[in-house]
């Protein structure tokens, strides 16, 4: 049996009291699967938190009803309110389902892509794309992937507050970037062999905060 270590780290936008990112996870008693959800509400503060909480909670509740996560994601897309000006959803999300047999299913919508490491090296998955339109106006694209987990595999996912950290600051004209985040994680895994989920997430978040010179311009979450 696989031992699964789940944790997260988070920092609010500078001078804000509430985080607009939400991470939830739950073990489904009926089939012993585990569902993890990270949602990033549009903007920051209370409104972003409410929308992200609604999105993550919906994903958890549908999982408890043993719904397929691909179907769950499509239902969420049809439920989420839309920004009337930008024609985009008010929240993004990543859903990960881990079954007792080690099969891991991932659905991603507009979040930075999940980073997977095996033997301390990045593992790149083939992803299928589901495209749809809601009310004949808003288009969306879901990335779907699945693979079999091996012992000591690492799955790291984060909000764009990580990948875009430092944007506009010296050395980060377009932010930290997903590739550099991946390189940083790979370095950590090589340096610290038995790094816990909490410690790994903490290191990523603290580095992202430092990229902003400790005055974060977005909510930051890593799980």
Stretches with model-predicted labels:
Residues 1-20:
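Regulatory cytosolic signal-relay segments
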Residues 2-5, 29-33, 99-103, 150-152:
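Beta-strand-turn-beta hairpins that frame and shape the catalytic cleft
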Residues 17-31, 126-167:
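Acidic loop->beta-strand submotif enriched in PP2C/PPM serine/threonine phosphatases
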Residues 22-79, 156, 167-184:
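Primarily the active-site beta-strand->alpha-helix module of PP2C/PPM metal-dependent phosphatases
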Residues 40-41, 111, 154-162, 219:
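DG-centered beta-turn motif at the end of beta-strands
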Residues 49-120, 142-144, 194-223:
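Catalytic core of PPM/PP2C metal-dependent serine/threonine phosphatase domains
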Residues 116-126, 172:
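A short alpha->loop->secondary-structure connector
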Residues 151, 162-223:
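C-terminal catalytic subdomain
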């Amino acid at each position: 049996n696989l031992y699964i270590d789940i944790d997260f780290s988070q920092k609010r936008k500078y001078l804000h009291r509430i985080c607009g990112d939400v991470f939830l996870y739950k073990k489904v008693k009926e089939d012993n699967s585990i569902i993890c959800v990270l949602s990033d509400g549009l903007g920051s503060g209370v409104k972003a938190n409410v929308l992200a909480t609604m999105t993550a909670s919906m994903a958890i509740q549908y999982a408890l009803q043993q719904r397929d996560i691909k179907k769950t994601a499509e239902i969420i897309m049809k439920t989420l309110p839309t920004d009337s000006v930008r024609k985009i959803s008010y929240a993004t999300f990543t859903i990960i389902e881990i079954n007792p047999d080690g099969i891991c299913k991932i659905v991603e919508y507009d979040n930075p892509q999940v980073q997977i490491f095996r033997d301390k090296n990045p593992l790149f998955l083939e992803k299928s794309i589901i495209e749809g339109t809601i009310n004949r106006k808003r288009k969306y694209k879901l990335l779907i992937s699945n693979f079999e987990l091996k012992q000591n595999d690492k799955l790291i996912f984060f909000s764009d507050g990580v990948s875009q950290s430092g944007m506009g600051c010296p050395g980060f004209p377009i932010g930290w970037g997903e590739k550099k985040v991946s390189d940083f994680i790979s370095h950590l895994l090589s340096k610290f062999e038995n790094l816990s989920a909490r410690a790994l997430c903490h290191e990523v978040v603290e580095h992202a905060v430092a990229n902003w010179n400790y005055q974060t311009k977005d909510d930051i979450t890593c799980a």
